[in-house]
Curated annotation (Swiss-Prot):
It catalyses: O-phospho-L-threonine + H(+) = (R)-1-aminopropan-2-yl phosphate + CO2. Its main location: cytoplasm. This is Threonine-phosphate decarboxylase. GO terms for biological process: cobalamin biosynthetic process. Its EC number is 4.1.1.81. It comes from Pseudomonas aeruginosa (strain ATCC 15692 / DSM 22644 / CIP 104116 / JCM 14847 / LMG 12228 / 1C / PRS 101 / PAO1). Keywords: Cobalamin biosynthesis, Cytoplasm, Lyase, Pyridoxal phosphate. Pathway: Cofactor biosynthesis; adenosylcobalamin biosynthesis. GO terms for cellular component: cytoplasm. Homodimer. Its cofactor is pyridoxal 5'-phosphate. The keyword Zinc-finger does not apply. InterPro entries: Aminotransferase_I/II_large (IPR004839), CobD (IPR005860), NHTrfase_class1_PyrdxlP-BS (IPR004838), PyrdxlP-dep_Trfase (IPR015424), PyrdxlP-dep_Trfase_major (IPR015421), PyrdxlP-dep_Trfase_small (IPR015422).
Length: 331
């Protein structure tokens, strides 16, 4: 199983720091969760029903013709590779590692390619996978470029799979409105923007036959009743959505400025995180962890991803820790 951010208990054991004393910046999850509605008893006592309004709320929010609710977009990441015969899959990298892993596990020939390699390789691929905005680089691809790639793939029966887990603050770059086109699949994550990662909810957007085939792969009742109720409330709450976007964008800019001020100019980022690429990243990760601040470390290349502090105390704590790193004699 691949390693992910958010492994706070493991860090607490490794660094011998109590769980409650940590500042977790290792995930790209909004630190301000949407308010939770009261959950009616029948959400617990009855089996979930697909016509309860969740799909309609998601279609309206994403601007999509059809959606399939998932137990997190991870469910589709693992199921989609089993819906095609073994073929050649290009994964625009670096990106969320589960994508390449899932296609390899299903027997496909996977090539992780850079942005400059898309054009020369595209006509030899059966599937191209793009994370947009990219995790961890923050790179955003414009719809016109992605749709041009899709058209070339679709002519040969290929797929363009776009993971838009971090798209909520930049909806103008989404392909959701085009997701009814054959061979185009869009994945959306609920937990990151809404700050409710524990709900384990995501959506696949695509044409009807493909979503029906994916539903057959996943089986019934993939999303439980309480989560369906909570998600409908959040997906329809335009005021909270607007406030969340403004807050996230402001916090991301503040984090970029804080890092830059301490001599760590970000190499990219999104509304939910900033990325550092520097040979000293491993040392910074360990230094911060020894002070109870958890970040997400990557090795190829040496880099760190930092999520957003939730409050002024957290901002001050990160500020002080970064200041201390400039003084190695104190270590």
């Amino acid at each position: 199983m691949l390693e992910h951010g958010g492994r706070l208990r493991e860090a607490a054991r490794r660094y011998d720091i109590p769980l409650a004393d940590w500042l977790d910046l290792s995930t790209g999850i909004a630190p301000w969760p949407f308010s939770l509605p009261a959950i009616p008893e029948q959400a617990w006592t009855r089996l979930p029903e697909s016509d309860d309004g969740l799909e309609a709320a998601a279609c309206l929010y994403y601007g999509a013709e059809r959606v399939l609710p998932l137990a997190g977009s991870q469910a589709a990441i693992q199921a989609l590779p089993r819906m095609r015969r073994g073929g050649r899959v290009g994964v625009l990298s670096p990106c969320y590692a589960e994508h390449a892993h899932a296609w390899r596990q299903a027997g496909h020939l996977v090539r992780e390619i850079g942005e400059a390699e898309v054009e020369p390789y595209l006509d030899s691929l059966d599937v191209l996978l793009v994370v947009n905005p990219n995790n961890p680089t923050g790179r955003v691809f414009e719809p016109a470029e992605l749709l041009a790639w899709h058209a070339r793939l679709q002519r040969r029966g290929g797929w363009l799979l776009v993971d838009e887990a971090f798209m909520d603050c930049t909806p103008q770059s989404s392909l959701a409105a085009c997701s009814n086109r054959p061979g185009l699949i869009v994945l959306r994550s609920f937990g990151k923007f809404f700050g409710l990662a524990g709900a384990r909810l995501g959506f696949a957007l695509g044409e009807r036959p493909l979503l029906q085939a994916l539903a057959e792969q996943l089986g019934p009742w993939t999303v439980n009743g309480p989560v369906r109720h909570v998600a409908q409330s959040a997906l329809r709450d335009r005021q909270q959505q607007r406030q969340q976007r403004e807050r996230l964008l402001a916090a991301s800019q503040r984090l970029e400025e804080l890092l830059r001020r301490h001599g760590w100019p970000p190499a990219g980022g999104s509304a939910l995180f900033q990325r550092l690429v520097d040979p000293r990243c491993a040392a910074l990760h360990d230094y911060l962890a020894r002070r109870g601040i958890l970040t997400r470390q990557f090795e190829q290349p040496a880099s760190l991803r930092l999520g957003l502090p939730a409050d002024e105390a957290a901002w001050a704590r990160l500020d002080a820790a970064l200041l201390g790193f400039k003084e190695p004699a104190h270590e």
